[in-house]
């Protein structure tokens, strides 16, 4: 296409020169030489362009081909959001802010006090924190109104040796005890609340009419996020059940209205 354009342009230029009687026409050899040079330049340009394309294709062919994402076949488990145990890193620990619960603590030392949200509970602490715990108990008793009693007696404590739990799917999972993070490993601690006894009084819960009702104190559970592994393979944050309160369960006695 470029060669044809050059020929047409030169023919047009020569026609203009022929009409101009005041100027001498170019010699025939000079015009032919100009046409040959233009054709050679165009051929060289096309040749260089083709060489550049070949080089680009050869370079791309040497690069490793990226594999397209493979769809899981029928019966094959989908990709899990949990990581293998060998691949666990600090990213899981960074997610604690998003999954944090006041009842779950990651620390390199055993906690001596209850979480700030649960200072008013009957905390069972270690002897080191006995004085501070007793002060908080006196403060809680001072704030309560005289003559008020709980239906059930409960106690709260930091569980330091939790090894297994039931997750939200009903599967038993392993609770990670020690987690390697940098130079100092951290452990998981769970602040749990449970009933001291099923029957604080002879016939059941305190203050319940035992003529018409059967009553019993039962420990209630709720879900919190914790670092766990399933089948000792996949590590991640899962919802697990822990003891969080003590409630009074009632049932009407048969034959009573």
From Swiss-Prot:
InterPro entries: Cystine-knot_cytokine, Nerve_growth_factor-like, Nerve_growth_factor-rel, Nerve_growth_factor_CS, Neurotrophin-3, NTF3_N. Glycans are attached at residue 131. Belongs to the NGF-beta family. One of its GO terms (biological process) is negative regulation of neuron apoptotic process. Residues 62-86 are annotated as: Disordered. The keyword Secreted applies. Its main location: secreted. It is found in: Secreted. PROSITE patterns: NGF_1, NGF_2. Residues 67-79 have a biased composition (Basic and acidic residues). Coiled coil: none annotated. This is Neurotrophin-3. GO terms for cellular component: axon; dendrite; extracellular space; synaptic vesicle. One of its GO terms (molecular function) is growth factor activity. Residues 19-138 form a propeptide. Keywords: Cleavage on pair of basic residues, Disulfide bond, Glycoprotein, Growth factor, Secreted, Signal. Residues 1-18 form the signal peptide. Disulfide bonds join 152-217, 195-246, 205-248. Seems to promote the survival of visceral and proprioceptive sensory neurons.
């Amino acid at each position: 296409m470029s060669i044809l354009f050059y020929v047409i342009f030169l023919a047009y230029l020569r026609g203009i020169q022929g009409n101009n009687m005041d100027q001498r026409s170019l010699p025939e050899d000079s015009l032919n030489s100009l046409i040959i040079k233009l054709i050679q330049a165009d051929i060289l340009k096309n040749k260089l362009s083709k060489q550049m394309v070949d080089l680009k294709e050869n370079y791309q062919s040497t690069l490793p081909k990226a594999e397209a994402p493979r769809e899981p076949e029928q019966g094959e488990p989908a990709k899990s959001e949990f990581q293998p145990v060998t691949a666990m890193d600090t990213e899981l620990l960074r997610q604690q802010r998003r999954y944090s619960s006041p009842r779950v603590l990651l620390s390199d030392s055993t906690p001596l006090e209850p979480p700030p949200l649960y200072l008013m509970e009957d905390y069972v602490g270690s002897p080191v924190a006995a004085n501070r715990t007793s002060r908080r108990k006196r403060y809680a008793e001072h704030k309560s109104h005289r003559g008020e009693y709980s239906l059930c007696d409960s106690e709260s404590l930091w569980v330091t040796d939790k090894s297994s739990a039931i997750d939200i799917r009903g599967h038993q999972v392993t609770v990670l005890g020690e987690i390697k993070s940098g130079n100092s490993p951290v452990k998981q601690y769970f602040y749990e609340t449970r009933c001291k006894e099923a029957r604080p009084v002879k016939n059941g819960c305190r203050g319940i009419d035992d003529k018409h009702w059967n009553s019993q104190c039962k420990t209630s559970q709720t879900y919190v996020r914790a670092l766990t592994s399933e089948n000792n393979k996949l590590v991640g944050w899962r919802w697990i059940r822990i003891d969080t309160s003590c409630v009074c369960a009632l049932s009407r006695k048969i034959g009573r209205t």
